[in-house]
Design a protein with these regions (language model features):
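Amphipathic alpha-helical "stem/stalk" segments
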Residues: 8-12, 31-170
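Alpha-helical transmembrane segments of integral membrane proteins
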Residues: 18-28
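Feature marks short, highly hydrophobic, charge-poor N-terminal signal-anchor/signal peptide-like helices
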Residues: 5-19
Length: 170
């Protein structure tokens, strides 16, 4: 009789382990999957940020183009115009990559925070008159949704107004 009781006890314990352990294992699995996704998203964001830093170095290496000025640089030589178009193409390519990898119609607060920094970069560059003027050429062959996004951004009032620091410098 003691033997059958221990068998019943073991059977009951196995049901309890199954009833508790399986849902717990699923929860742990889902948590690990989310954490892995978050880490991958953070890695993508970091790589894009590093690429933007590299772009800024290229812009700094070309001071004659005055790429950090809000106004269009006047009287550029043919070679300078060509360099500027190449640099702006690099920037559009980076913006498109950021859009394709980071933008989602519905984002978590963390995703929205990451995306907002890129939206700010895009808005900042769209404030440049010469950048906006070159957009039709720069956007040829780019992703249609990205093209629509950047055109909307470039056409917005905030893109046409100088940034606060630019307005203060005047």
């Amino acid at each position: 009789d003691a033997r059958s009781m221990s068998l019943e006890t073991w059977e009951l314990l196995s049901y309890v382990v199954t009833a508790v352990g399986l849902p717990l294992a699923i929860i742990v699995f889902l948590y690990e999957q989310k954490r892995e996704r978050d880490n991958e998203e953070e890695e993508v964001y970091q790589l894009l940020s590093d690429n933007y830093q590299d772009f800024l170095k290229v812009a700094l290496d070309n001071p004659d183009l005055r790429l950090f000025s809000a106004e269009q640089t006047p009287d550029l030589t043919k070679e300078q115009r060509e360099r500027k178009i190449i640099i702006f193409n690099m920037l559009i390519s980076l913006f498109e990559r950021a859009y394709l990898l980071l933008y989602e119609p519905k984002m978590s607060p963390q995703q929205a925070r990451r995306w907002s920094s890129w939206a700010d970069y895009m808005r900042e560059w769209c404030r440049r008159e010469d950048f906006r003027a070159l957009l039709p050429v720069l956007l040829e062959g780019e992703d249609a949704e990205f093209v629509s996004y950047i055109r909307t951004l470039a056409g917005s009032k905030s893109a046409r107004q100088p940034a606060p620091e630019q307005a203060a410098a005047r």
